[in-house]
């Protein structure tokens, strides 16, 4: 026992000397430092890789979310529903509630419109109380009725102008049409000349002129001789009348 215990005690200083030696301390310290630094480096590297992976995943997710065509399926229907709801709300706000008038209300409104197209506030309020409507509804009805009245007036004026233009154009065309004269009856001589040749017509005309010229000369000579005889007889009669002393 003592020998074994002494051997153990002897080995302990030897081990202690080995551990306490400078070379062994440096080796152990180097191993320790190496292992810690290595672990730290691995941990830091793992943390950096994980961080980079998280950043890449986050950027990819953000790009996918920000892209208009690659939105998430859970968000797209919700956004579409929100947009539709907002548009429906806007349409509901813009849409006005139409008022339906009964026959008695329309008769009363038309009766007042025949009197005046622009009733004042007192008339509108009184009429609204009578027909069980608000003054704003009565005012809107008169605005719409005036617009309808103006449209009807413009349509009537356009139809009247169109009819006047049509009648005027018809009168102008009737005046501008020339009156065709009736064909005058043609004499037989003209027809005979038209049928005969020009040479024969000229020969006939010259022959008639030649035949008529001696007769005309004789007649003129006879008339001159008659005038001379009458003058002589008149002078003789004056000479034979006795003069009174």
Swiss-Prot record:
Subunit structure: Interacts with SMAD3.
GO molecular function: DNA binding; DNA-binding transcription activator activity, RNA polymerase II-specific; DNA-binding transcription repressor activity, RNA polymerase II-specific; HMG box domain binding; RNA polymerase II cis-regulatory region sequence-specific DNA binding; RNA polymerase II general transcription initiation factor activity; RNA polymerase II-specific DNA-binding transcription factor binding
Any Gene Ontology biological process: stem cell proliferation
Record-linked SUPFAM superfamilies: Homeodomain-like (SSF46689)
Transmembrane portions of the chain: none
Superkingdom field: Eukaryota
The family this protein is said to belong to: Belongs to the paired homeobox family.
Residues where N6-acetyllysine is found: 160
Subcellular compartments: Nucleus
Nucleus keyword on record: yes
Annotated effect of mutating residue 228 to A/P: Increased transcriptional activation. No effect on DNA binding
DNA-binding residue intervals: 94-153
GO-annotated cellular components: cytosol; nucleoplasm; nucleus
Protein function: Master transcription factor of stromal fibroblasts for myofibroblastic lineage progression. Orchestrates the functional drift of fibroblasts into myofibroblastic phenotype via TGF-beta signaling by remodeling a super-enhancer landscape. Through this function, plays an essential role in wound healing process. Acts as a transcriptional regulator of muscle creatine kinase (MCK) and so has a role in the establishment of diverse mesodermal muscle types. The protein binds to an A/T-rich element in the muscle creatine enhancer.
Phylogenetic lineage: Eukaryota, Metazoa, Chordata, Craniata, Vertebrata
Modified residues (Phosphoserine): 21, 197
Gene3D superfamilies membership: Homeodomain-like
Residue window of motif OAR: 222-235
Name the UniProt record assigns to this protein: Paired mesoderm homeobox protein 1
Ranges where the record places region Disordered: 1-24, 54-103
Tissue-wise expression: Expressed in skeletal muscle, heart and uterus. Detected in a limited numbers of cells in connective tissues, in bone, inguinal white adipose tissue and dermis; these cells are thought to be stem cells.
PROSITE patterns: HOMEOBOX_1, HOMEOBOX_2, OAR
Outcome of mutating residue 226 to P: No effect on transcriptional activity
Main location: nucleus
Pfam families, alphabetized: Homeodomain, OAR
Entry keywords, A to Z: Acetylation, Developmental protein, DNA-binding, Homeobox, Nucleus, Phosphoprotein
